[in-house]
């Protein structure tokens, strides 16, 4: 009888879902070097310099992170071990870009990281947690707030409204890192974005200032003077090597 009970218990335990135990925080360098990262993400490191970027922006253990457009888990798989069990990473993904394949891959990733979750909403109506984030990252996507596309169901949007939602999601004193492809100065921002998927850094500075943010720093670590700025970032001649700015904005205390 005892053996029967033990066998039954073994079956129950085997069938129970395995939840990853919380792990103590690690350094940014250790998180970047982790063999647990997806190989397709690791391939992007040379062009993105994640360790240098996150160090510059100030990611630390215990932070609440808002990772915008982050369902590919490129940044989240580094952020999660760095913030550790006392921090949390919330990924926001537009519903227009959260299809079955992405849902599956992110679900598998989140199952291994108890301090990671995801929220989704339409691109044009970002539903973000209020007064939540100590740290926000927006990588290569701010220009898309000036983009519209019928194929993907993206209407013409108001960048100011998008930034207002981000501002409300951040705690006083929180930082947001903004990385994007550099465009040459042009009076028609939307036309430039439509053609090149790039944005003038001065437009970004002005937009964030108008939204109430303070520029706390900038870095040239991803600049590339050899970029002709005349192709979109998906062109094989420049893919992964575009001229990019890195801005660090802060929400005033």
For the regions a language model picked out, list residue spans one by one.
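A short acidic, Gly/Pro-enriched loop at the edge of an enzyme's catalytic core
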Residues: 63, 126-140
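Conserved class I S-adenosyl-L-methionine
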Residues: 62-71
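S-adenosyl-L-methionine
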Residues: 101-127
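Core SAM-dependent methyltransferase catalytic element
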Residues: 211, 226-253
């Amino acid at each position: 009888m005892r053996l029967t009970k033990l066998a039954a218990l073994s079956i129950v335990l085997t069938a129970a879902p395995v939840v990853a135990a919380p792990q103590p925080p690690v350094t940014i360098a250790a998180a970047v070097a982790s063999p647990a990262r997806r190989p397709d993400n690791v391939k992007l490191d040379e062009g993105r310099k994640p360790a240098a970027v996150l160090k510059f922006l100030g990611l630390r253990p215990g932070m609440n992170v808002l990772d915008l457009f982050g369902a590919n888990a490129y940044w989240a798989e580094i952020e999660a071990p760095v913030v550790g069990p006392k921090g949390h990473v919330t990924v926001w993904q537009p519903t227009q870009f959260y299809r079955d394949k992405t849902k599956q891959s992110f679900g598998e990733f989140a199952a291994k990281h108890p301090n990671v979750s995801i929220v989704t909403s339409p691109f044009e109506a970002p539903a973000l947690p209020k007064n939540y984030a100590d740290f926000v990252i927006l990588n290569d996507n701010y220009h898309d707030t000036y983009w519209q596309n019928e194929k993907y169901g993206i209407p013409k949007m108001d960048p100011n409204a998008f930034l207002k939602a981000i501002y409300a999601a951040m705690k006083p004193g929180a930082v947001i890192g903004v990385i994007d492809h550099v465009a040459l100065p042009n009076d028609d921002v939307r036309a430039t974005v439509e053609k090149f998927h790039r944005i003038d850094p001065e437009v970004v500075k002005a937009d964030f200032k108008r939204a109430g943010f303070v520029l706390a720093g900038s870095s040239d670590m991803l600049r590339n003077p050899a970029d002709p700025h005349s192709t979109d970032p998906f062109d094989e001649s420049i893919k992964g090597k575009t001229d990019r700015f890195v801005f660090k904005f802060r929400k005033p205390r």
